[in-house]
Protein backbone atom coordinates (compact mmCIF):
# COMPACT_ATOMS: atom_id res chain seq x y z
CA UNK A 1 0.00 0.00 0.00
CA UNK A 2 2.95 2.35 0.59
CA UNK A 3 4.54 1.84 -2.81
CA UNK A 4 2.60 4.63 -4.63
CA UNK A 5 3.67 7.06 -1.92
CA UNK A 6 7.31 6.10 -2.35
CA UNK A 7 7.06 6.45 -6.13
CA UNK A 8 5.45 9.87 -5.75
CA UNK A 9 8.28 10.98 -3.46
CA UNK A 10 10.89 9.80 -5.95
CA UNK A 11 9.19 11.68 -8.79
CA UNK A 12 8.94 14.80 -6.63
CA UNK A 13 12.64 14.59 -5.76
CA UNK A 14 13.51 14.27 -9.45
CA UNK A 15 11.41 17.31 -10.33
CA UNK A 16 13.02 19.33 -7.53
CA UNK A 17 16.48 18.26 -8.71
CA UNK A 18 15.74 19.41 -12.26
CA UNK A 19 14.36 22.72 -10.99
CA UNK A 20 17.44 23.26 -8.83
CA UNK A 21 19.68 22.52 -11.80
CA UNK A 22 17.93 25.15 -13.93
CA UNK A 23 18.52 27.74 -11.22
CA UNK A 24 22.16 26.65 -10.87
CA UNK A 25 22.76 27.02 -14.62
CA UNK A 26 21.30 30.51 -14.45
CA UNK A 27 23.59 31.43 -11.56
CA UNK A 28 26.71 29.68 -12.86
CA UNK A 29 26.54 31.39 -16.23
CA UNK A 30 25.77 34.83 -14.84
CA UNK A 31 22.19 34.74 -16.11
CA UNK A 32 19.44 36.87 -14.65
CA UNK A 33 16.72 34.24 -14.49
CA UNK A 34 14.20 36.21 -16.50
CA UNK A 35 13.73 33.66 -19.29
CA UNK A 36 12.21 30.40 -18.01
CA UNK A 37 12.98 28.64 -21.28
CA UNK A 38 15.15 25.64 -20.39
CA UNK A 39 16.48 25.37 -23.94
CA UNK A 40 17.87 28.91 -23.89
CA UNK A 41 19.54 28.42 -20.52
CA UNK A 42 21.24 25.22 -21.65
CA UNK A 43 22.27 26.69 -25.00
CA UNK A 44 24.10 29.50 -23.22
CA UNK A 45 26.60 26.87 -22.06
CA UNK A 46 27.87 26.86 -25.67
CA UNK A 47 30.20 29.83 -25.05
CA UNK A 48 31.19 31.42 -28.38
CA UNK A 49 29.10 28.82 -30.24
CA UNK A 50 25.94 30.35 -28.77
CA UNK A 51 23.69 31.97 -31.36
CA UNK A 52 22.94 35.69 -31.10
CA UNK A 53 20.21 36.82 -28.72
CA UNK A 54 18.13 39.75 -29.95
CA UNK A 55 16.77 41.91 -27.15
CA UNK A 56 14.76 45.11 -26.86
CA UNK A 57 16.59 48.19 -28.13
CA UNK A 58 16.95 50.94 -25.54
CA UNK A 59 18.47 54.29 -26.52
CA UNK A 60 19.40 57.14 -24.20
CA UNK A 61 18.64 60.47 -25.94
CA UNK A 62 21.76 62.42 -26.96
CA UNK A 63 22.56 65.85 -25.53
CA UNK A 64 20.50 68.65 -27.03
CA UNK A 65 21.51 69.60 -30.56
CA UNK A 66 23.47 66.42 -31.35
CA UNK A 67 22.45 64.13 -34.20
CA UNK A 68 24.03 60.87 -35.43
CA UNK A 69 25.91 61.13 -38.72
CA UNK A 70 28.28 58.13 -38.95
CA UNK A 71 28.59 54.53 -37.70
CA UNK A 72 31.85 52.61 -37.44
CA UNK A 73 31.14 48.90 -37.04
CA UNK A 74 32.72 45.49 -36.47
CA UNK A 75 30.66 42.32 -36.83
CA UNK A 76 31.62 38.75 -36.11
CA UNK A 77 30.30 36.26 -38.66
CA UNK A 78 26.93 34.74 -37.84
CA UNK A 79 26.05 31.26 -36.62
CA UNK A 80 28.12 28.65 -38.40
CA UNK A 81 29.10 25.02 -38.56
CA UNK A 82 31.99 23.75 -36.45
CA UNK A 83 35.55 24.30 -37.55
CA UNK A 84 38.33 21.82 -36.86
CA UNK A 85 37.87 18.08 -36.44
CA UNK A 86 35.34 17.92 -33.58
CA UNK A 87 32.65 16.28 -35.72
CA UNK A 88 35.00 13.99 -37.65
CA UNK A 89 36.81 12.81 -34.52
CA UNK A 90 33.57 12.16 -32.65
CA UNK A 91 32.10 10.26 -35.57
CA UNK A 92 35.26 8.16 -36.01
CA UNK A 93 35.31 7.23 -32.32
CA UNK A 94 31.67 6.15 -32.35
CA UNK A 95 31.93 4.32 -35.69
CA UNK A 96 34.96 2.38 -34.45
CA UNK A 97 33.17 1.40 -31.26
CA UNK A 98 30.11 0.35 -33.27
CA UNK A 99 32.27 -1.84 -35.49
CA UNK A 100 33.70 -3.54 -32.39
CA UNK A 101 30.29 -3.95 -30.76
CA UNK A 102 31.22 -1.55 -27.96
CA UNK A 103 28.30 0.91 -28.04
CA UNK A 104 25.47 0.87 -25.55
CA UNK A 105 21.92 1.48 -26.76
CA UNK A 106 22.38 5.14 -25.84
CA UNK A 107 25.66 5.16 -27.73
CA UNK A 108 23.92 3.80 -30.82
CA UNK A 109 21.33 6.58 -30.64
CA UNK A 110 24.12 9.13 -30.28
CA UNK A 111 25.86 7.70 -33.35
CA UNK A 112 22.70 8.16 -35.42
CA UNK A 113 22.49 11.81 -34.34
CA UNK A 114 26.18 12.49 -34.95
CA UNK A 115 25.88 11.05 -38.45
CA UNK A 116 23.20 13.65 -39.17
CA UNK A 117 25.49 16.42 -37.94
CA UNK A 118 28.40 15.03 -39.95
CA UNK A 119 26.22 15.06 -43.07
CA UNK A 120 25.41 18.74 -42.45
CA UNK A 121 29.17 19.41 -42.20
CA UNK A 122 30.21 17.48 -45.30
CA UNK A 123 32.27 19.85 -47.48
CA UNK A 124 30.89 22.69 -45.30
CA UNK A 125 33.29 22.81 -42.34
CA UNK A 126 33.07 26.22 -40.68
CA UNK A 127 30.56 27.59 -43.19
CA UNK A 128 27.72 29.95 -42.32
CA UNK A 129 24.31 28.45 -41.55
CA UNK A 130 20.93 29.86 -42.50
CA UNK A 131 20.53 31.08 -38.93
CA UNK A 132 23.78 33.02 -39.30
CA UNK A 133 22.52 34.66 -42.49
CA UNK A 134 19.28 35.61 -40.76
CA UNK A 135 21.19 37.14 -37.85
CA UNK A 136 23.09 39.53 -40.08
CA UNK A 137 20.08 40.56 -42.10
CA UNK A 138 18.19 41.35 -38.93
CA UNK A 139 21.13 43.24 -37.39
CA UNK A 140 21.42 45.44 -40.47
CA UNK A 141 17.71 46.25 -40.48
CA UNK A 142 17.80 47.13 -36.78
CA UNK A 143 20.84 49.38 -37.22
CA UNK A 144 19.24 51.27 -40.11
CA UNK A 145 15.96 51.71 -38.23
CA UNK A 146 17.78 52.84 -35.10
CA UNK A 147 19.75 55.61 -36.84
CA UNK A 148 17.58 56.94 -39.69
CA UNK A 149 19.56 60.20 -39.81
CA UNK A 150 22.64 58.20 -40.83
CA UNK A 151 21.02 55.85 -43.31
CA UNK A 152 19.29 58.25 -45.66
CA UNK A 153 20.06 60.16 -48.86
CA UNK A 154 22.80 59.09 -51.28
CA UNK A 155 25.79 58.28 -49.12
CA UNK A 156 28.65 55.81 -49.10
CA UNK A 157 29.43 52.69 -47.03
CA UNK A 158 32.93 51.21 -46.94
CA UNK A 159 33.15 47.47 -46.22
CA UNK A 160 36.21 45.48 -45.16
CA UNK A 161 36.16 41.74 -44.64
CA UNK A 162 38.31 38.85 -43.51
CA UNK A 163 38.79 36.22 -46.18
CA UNK A 164 36.85 33.22 -44.84
CA UNK A 165 33.62 32.26 -46.60
CA UNK A 166 31.48 32.51 -43.46
CA UNK A 167 32.61 36.10 -43.03
CA UNK A 168 32.06 37.06 -46.66
CA UNK A 169 28.57 35.54 -46.68
CA UNK A 170 27.75 37.33 -43.42
CA UNK A 171 28.85 40.58 -45.03
CA UNK A 172 26.71 39.86 -48.10
CA UNK A 173 23.59 39.29 -46.00
CA UNK A 174 24.21 42.37 -43.85
CA UNK A 175 24.87 44.73 -46.75
CA UNK A 176 21.98 43.42 -48.86
CA UNK A 177 19.58 44.11 -46.00
CA UNK A 178 21.14 47.53 -45.44
CA UNK A 179 20.82 48.32 -49.15
CA UNK A 180 17.11 47.49 -48.93
CA UNK A 181 16.80 49.99 -46.07
CA UNK A 182 18.91 52.66 -47.81
CA UNK A 183 18.50 52.07 -51.57
CA UNK A 184 20.39 55.23 -52.58
CA UNK A 185 23.56 54.11 -50.79
CA UNK A 186 26.68 52.92 -52.61
CA UNK A 187 28.90 50.19 -51.15
CA UNK A 188 32.65 49.65 -51.58
CA UNK A 189 34.06 46.18 -50.76
CA UNK A 190 37.60 44.99 -50.13
CA UNK A 191 39.24 41.89 -48.66
CA UNK A 192 42.60 40.12 -48.76
CA UNK A 193 45.37 38.86 -46.51
CA UNK A 194 46.09 42.41 -45.34
CA UNK A 195 42.54 42.75 -44.03
CA UNK A 196 42.48 39.23 -42.65
CA UNK A 197 45.47 40.07 -40.46
CA UNK A 198 44.05 43.36 -39.26
CA UNK A 199 40.50 42.13 -38.65
CA UNK A 200 41.47 38.79 -37.13
CA UNK A 201 44.34 40.12 -35.06
CA UNK A 202 44.85 37.24 -32.58
CA UNK A 203 48.08 36.47 -30.80
CA UNK A 204 48.50 33.18 -32.68
CA UNK A 205 48.84 35.16 -35.91
CA UNK A 206 51.71 37.16 -34.42
CA UNK A 207 54.23 34.36 -33.97
CA UNK A 208 53.77 34.01 -30.21
CA UNK A 209 53.20 30.25 -30.24
CA UNK A 210 54.65 29.96 -26.73
CA UNK A 211 51.70 31.95 -25.38
CA UNK A 212 49.24 29.73 -27.23
CA UNK A 213 50.96 26.70 -25.70
CA UNK A 214 50.68 28.20 -22.21
CA UNK A 215 46.99 28.91 -22.73
CA UNK A 216 46.39 25.35 -23.92
CA UNK A 217 48.26 23.91 -20.95
CA UNK A 218 46.28 26.06 -18.50
CA UNK A 219 42.88 25.30 -20.03
CA UNK A 220 43.66 21.58 -20.39
CA UNK A 221 44.56 21.49 -16.70
CA UNK A 222 41.31 23.26 -15.87
CA UNK A 223 39.39 20.68 -17.91
CA UNK A 224 41.05 17.72 -16.19
CA UNK A 225 40.28 19.21 -12.79
CA UNK A 226 36.64 20.08 -13.49
CA UNK A 227 35.25 17.47 -15.90
CA UNK A 228 34.23 14.04 -14.60
CA UNK A 229 34.04 12.25 -17.94
CA UNK A 230 33.75 8.69 -16.65
CA UNK A 231 29.93 8.55 -16.30
CA UNK A 232 29.40 9.90 -19.83
CA UNK A 233 31.80 7.36 -21.32
CA UNK A 234 30.16 4.54 -19.38
CA UNK A 235 26.74 5.51 -20.75
CA UNK A 236 27.98 5.52 -24.36
CA UNK A 237 30.51 2.66 -24.49
CA UNK A 238 29.76 -0.85 -23.27
CA UNK A 239 33.36 -2.04 -22.93
CA UNK A 240 36.91 -0.76 -23.04
CA UNK A 241 38.02 -2.81 -26.05
CA UNK A 242 37.78 0.27 -28.30
CA UNK A 243 40.43 2.82 -27.23
CA UNK A 244 38.84 6.14 -26.27
CA UNK A 245 40.50 9.32 -25.03
CA UNK A 246 37.68 9.93 -22.57
CA UNK A 247 38.38 13.59 -21.79
CA UNK A 248 38.85 14.49 -25.45
CA UNK A 249 35.67 12.63 -26.37
CA UNK A 250 33.67 14.49 -23.71
CA UNK A 251 34.94 17.88 -24.87
CA UNK A 252 34.48 17.04 -28.57
CA UNK A 253 30.93 15.77 -28.21
CA UNK A 254 30.04 18.82 -26.10
CA UNK A 255 31.27 21.08 -28.92
CA UNK A 256 29.09 19.07 -31.30
CA UNK A 257 26.13 19.51 -28.95
CA UNK A 258 26.80 23.23 -28.67
CA UNK A 259 26.77 23.85 -32.42
CA UNK A 260 23.33 22.28 -32.95
CA UNK A 261 21.62 25.59 -32.13
CA UNK A 262 23.44 27.17 -35.09
CA UNK A 263 22.00 24.45 -37.35
CA UNK A 264 18.44 24.89 -36.20
CA UNK A 265 17.21 25.61 -39.73
CA UNK A 266 19.08 22.64 -41.24
CA UNK A 267 18.58 20.11 -38.40
CA UNK A 268 15.42 21.20 -36.63
CA UNK A 269 14.84 19.41 -33.33
CA UNK A 270 18.22 17.67 -33.09
CA UNK A 271 19.42 17.81 -29.48
CA UNK A 272 22.76 16.35 -28.40
CA UNK A 273 22.52 17.93 -24.95
CA UNK A 274 20.11 15.14 -23.99
CA UNK A 275 23.05 12.75 -23.70
CA UNK A 276 24.55 14.82 -20.85
CA UNK A 277 23.53 15.24 -17.24
CA UNK A 278 22.95 18.70 -15.80
CA UNK A 279 26.24 18.47 -13.92
CA UNK A 280 28.15 17.55 -17.08
CA UNK A 281 26.65 20.45 -19.03
CA UNK A 282 27.65 22.79 -16.22
CA UNK A 283 31.24 21.51 -16.01
CA UNK A 284 31.81 21.30 -19.76
CA UNK A 285 30.17 24.69 -20.33
CA UNK A 286 32.38 26.34 -17.74
CA UNK A 287 35.46 24.76 -19.27
CA UNK A 288 34.55 25.86 -22.79
CA UNK A 289 33.84 29.43 -21.65
CA UNK A 290 37.13 29.67 -19.76
CA UNK A 291 39.06 28.28 -22.72
CA UNK A 292 37.63 30.82 -25.15
CA UNK A 293 38.10 33.74 -22.76
CA UNK A 294 41.74 32.79 -22.13
CA UNK A 295 42.32 32.48 -25.86
CA UNK A 296 40.97 35.85 -26.96
CA UNK A 297 39.96 38.20 -24.15
CA UNK A 298 41.49 40.39 -21.47
CA UNK A 299 42.43 37.70 -18.95
CA UNK A 300 44.74 38.47 -16.04
CA UNK A 301 47.09 35.70 -17.15
CA UNK A 302 47.24 36.13 -20.93
CA UNK A 303 45.24 39.21 -21.94
CA UNK A 304 48.10 41.54 -22.85
CA UNK A 305 48.99 39.45 -25.89
CA UNK A 306 45.62 39.33 -27.72
CA UNK A 307 44.98 42.98 -26.84
CA UNK A 308 48.30 43.94 -28.40
CA UNK A 309 47.18 42.15 -31.56
CA UNK A 310 44.14 44.45 -31.91
CA UNK A 311 46.03 47.77 -32.04
CA UNK A 312 46.04 47.95 -35.84
CA UNK A 313 42.29 47.42 -35.82
CA UNK A 314 41.86 50.21 -33.28
CA UNK A 315 43.99 52.43 -35.50
CA UNK A 316 41.68 51.66 -38.42
CA UNK A 317 38.68 52.83 -36.39
CA UNK A 318 40.52 56.05 -35.56
CA UNK A 319 41.69 56.89 -39.07
CA UNK A 320 38.41 56.08 -40.79
CA UNK A 321 36.44 58.08 -38.24
CA UNK A 322 38.65 61.09 -38.93
CA UNK A 323 37.94 60.69 -42.65
CA UNK A 324 34.19 60.41 -42.09
CA UNK A 325 34.13 63.47 -39.85
CA UNK A 326 35.76 65.43 -42.68
CA UNK A 327 33.59 63.91 -45.44
CA UNK A 328 29.80 64.04 -45.08
CA UNK A 329 29.45 61.52 -47.90
CA UNK A 330 30.62 58.62 -45.72
CA UNK A 331 27.76 57.11 -43.72
CA UNK A 332 29.42 54.00 -42.30
CA UNK A 333 32.46 51.79 -42.16
CA UNK A 334 31.55 48.12 -41.84
CA UNK A 335 34.06 45.44 -40.84
CA UNK A 336 33.38 41.72 -40.82
CA UNK A 337 35.60 39.24 -39.06
CA UNK A 338 35.90 36.87 -36.15
CA UNK A 339 35.63 36.61 -32.38
CA UNK A 340 39.42 36.75 -32.21
CA UNK A 341 39.31 40.25 -33.71
CA UNK A 342 36.41 41.70 -31.74
CA UNK A 343 36.95 40.44 -28.19
CA UNK A 344 40.51 41.80 -27.83
CA UNK A 345 39.33 45.15 -29.21
CA UNK A 346 36.72 45.40 -26.45
CA UNK A 347 39.51 44.96 -23.91
CA UNK A 348 41.77 47.48 -25.60
CA UNK A 349 39.04 50.14 -25.69
CA UNK A 350 38.18 49.41 -22.05
CA UNK A 351 34.52 48.44 -22.43
CA UNK A 352 32.94 47.49 -19.14
CA UNK A 353 31.60 43.98 -19.57
CA UNK A 354 33.21 42.43 -22.66
CA UNK A 355 36.55 44.09 -21.90
CA UNK A 356 36.70 43.14 -18.22
CA UNK A 357 40.01 41.77 -16.94
CA UNK A 358 39.47 38.74 -14.70
CA UNK A 359 41.31 35.47 -13.99
CA UNK A 360 40.44 33.08 -16.81
CA UNK A 361 39.15 30.45 -14.37
CA UNK A 362 36.48 32.91 -13.16
CA UNK A 363 35.49 34.17 -16.60
CA UNK A 364 32.56 31.76 -17.05
CA UNK A 365 30.85 33.78 -14.31
CA UNK A 366 32.45 37.24 -14.46
CA UNK A 367 32.78 37.72 -18.25
CA UNK A 368 30.57 35.04 -19.81
CA UNK A 369 31.23 34.27 -23.45
CA UNK A 370 27.57 33.52 -24.25
CA UNK A 371 26.80 37.15 -23.43
CA UNK A 372 29.83 38.94 -24.84
CA UNK A 373 30.94 36.79 -27.78
CA UNK A 374 28.04 34.83 -29.29
CA UNK A 375 27.79 34.34 -33.02
CA UNK A 376 27.20 37.64 -34.85
CA UNK A 377 28.59 39.70 -31.95
CA UNK A 378 29.02 43.30 -32.98
CA UNK A 379 30.41 46.67 -31.99
CA UNK A 380 29.01 49.95 -33.29
CA UNK A 381 30.67 53.30 -32.64
CA UNK A 382 27.93 55.83 -33.34
CA UNK A 383 29.12 59.40 -33.95
CA UNK A 384 27.02 62.49 -33.15
CA UNK A 385 27.65 66.12 -34.10
CA UNK A 386 26.06 69.47 -33.27
CA UNK A 387 25.88 72.68 -35.28
CA UNK A 388 29.14 73.89 -33.73
CA UNK A 389 30.98 70.83 -35.06
CA UNK A 390 31.52 69.15 -31.68
CA UNK A 391 31.67 65.36 -32.01
CA UNK A 392 30.45 62.82 -29.47
CA UNK A 393 30.49 59.04 -29.73
CA UNK A 394 28.67 56.23 -28.00
CA UNK A 395 29.58 52.58 -28.27
CA UNK A 396 27.04 49.83 -28.69
CA UNK A 397 28.22 46.30 -28.02
CA UNK A 398 25.78 43.62 -29.10
CA UNK A 399 23.41 46.57 -29.50
CA UNK A 400 23.72 47.60 -25.83
CA UNK A 401 24.98 51.02 -24.72
CA UNK A 402 28.40 50.62 -23.11
CA UNK A 403 30.52 52.32 -20.47
CA UNK A 404 34.17 52.99 -21.26
CA UNK A 405 36.40 52.46 -18.27
CA UNK A 406 38.50 55.51 -17.39
CA UNK A 407 36.71 58.00 -19.67
CA UNK A 408 34.30 60.67 -18.45
CA UNK A 409 30.89 60.63 -20.21
CA UNK A 410 29.09 63.85 -21.17
CA UNK A 411 26.70 62.36 -20.01
CA UNK A 412 26.64 58.55 -20.34
CA UNK A 413 26.53 56.82 -22.76
CA UNK A 414 28.02 59.68 -24.79
CA UNK A 415 31.75 60.44 -24.75
CA UNK A 416 33.87 63.10 -26.42
CA UNK A 417 35.42 61.68 -29.55
CA UNK A 418 38.59 63.61 -28.70
CA UNK A 419 38.90 61.63 -25.45
CA UNK A 420 38.33 58.23 -27.06
CA UNK A 421 40.57 59.17 -29.97
CA UNK A 422 43.37 60.06 -27.57
CA UNK A 423 43.01 56.67 -25.90
CA UNK A 424 43.15 54.79 -29.20
CA UNK A 425 46.07 56.89 -30.41
CA UNK A 426 47.91 56.36 -27.13
CA UNK A 427 47.46 52.60 -27.34
CA UNK A 428 48.80 52.65 -30.89
CA UNK A 429 51.93 54.49 -29.73
CA UNK A 430 52.47 51.90 -26.98
CA UNK A 431 52.85 49.18 -29.61
CA UNK A 432 55.56 51.06 -31.53
PLM ranges: what are they?
Residues 6-18:
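Bacterial N-terminal signal peptides that target proteins for export
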Residues 13-14, 27, 76:
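Residue-level micro-sites within transmembrane alpha helices that shape
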Residues 17-28:
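Bacterial N-terminal signal peptides
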Residues 33-158, 162-333, 337-432:
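Signature for phosphate-centric chemistry
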